Amino acid sequence: MFLQSRASRLLAQLRAAGQLLGAPRPWPGPSPGATRTRSSACGPLASLSAHHPCARTSAGVGAWGAAAVGRRAGVRAWAPLAMAAKVDLSTSTDWREAKSFLKGLSDKQREEHYFCRDFVRLKKIPTWKETAKGVTVKVEEPKYKKDKQLNEKISLFRGDITKLEVDAIVNAANSSLLGGGGVDGCIHRAAGPLLTDECRTLQNCETGKAKITCGYRLPAKYVIHTVGPIAHGEPSASQAAELRSCYLSSLDLLLEHRLRSAAFPCISTGVFGYPNEAAAEVVLTALREWLEQHKDKAQQALMQVDRLIICVFLEKDENIYRERLPHYFPVA
């Protein structure tokens, strides 16, 4: 009797403590005539994640409640109050859970979840100002004036865009946003199936527009998906405008989400058939004019973009941009 009485007192104390903390208490069962229902409210802890130790379990009783009805209702029942479990991005089936988990990590902690170990940090990517030292193209009449500040915000990089550790990489997507060939397929495979799951909720994308998702297993924190025009042969004025809109829409999302660095692939120049040289002219004009328009805001600390990277994969495209960049971002 003494032991039973003592256990009852301990149980009552633990229940009272749980009530003071706003944690859910174990349901003792219905009173006579009551239906077997209970409120889903959880007091001050109602907003906590399902993986928080004080959140409800699938059975409707939180860790606090589970502690209170432990095998012997002793002080050791506090043990369940532990750190939330780490999300495994390779097996998780909940993109919302994974996205929330990644947002709570530091840059160093995110590295553990990258799909690759040979990722490229932003500081390892030279600016156009540095790259231009090895460019022998002479431009007598550049299209724009020399601007040292803007030359430090542009980079030309040849390599795998999926391995760049930047705030966002841009995906040359199709209208479904569910993955395809070329760089689109590479990005989806590297990021993992959760990227496709989130894209499925975006319900397609129009040509020239852009939408943003988490980067998941990519070194990039976000993926900006944009749909370029299909242009086989000489592009029309409307197709050129749509390609320009791809870059400007992506840059708008960059500002909206307060991101500081982004890498762009060659949009529409693959299976979409846009001529590489013509595309480069559209791209460089759009980037130069956008940077100039936002330059004053940057100086007022209203907008800070550290780097815009033109990421090419083919030697052909690298040569085109090396030849055209001095016309839009002169260094001499």
Regions found by a protein language model. Name each.
Residues 161-162, 175, 217, 268-270, ...:
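Conserved beta-strand elements of beta-rich interaction domains across eukaryotes
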Residues 133, 197-221:
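N-terminal short beta-loop-beta anion/metal-coordinating cradle
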Residues 167, 221, 260:
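Conserved acidic residues
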Residues 144-207:
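Short, conserved "active-site rim" segments that organize catalytic pockets and cofactor/ligand binding
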Residues 2-29, 33-64, 68-80, 84-86, ...:
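Phosphate/ribose-phosphate-bearing ligand recognition and processing surfaces
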Residues 170, 187, 224, 264, ...:
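Conserved, mostly hydrophobic/aromatic
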Residues 218-233:
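Short, basic/glycine-rich phosphate-binding loops at helix/coil junctions
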Residues 4, 70-152:
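An N-cap/entry alpha-helix motif that binds or orients negatively charged groups
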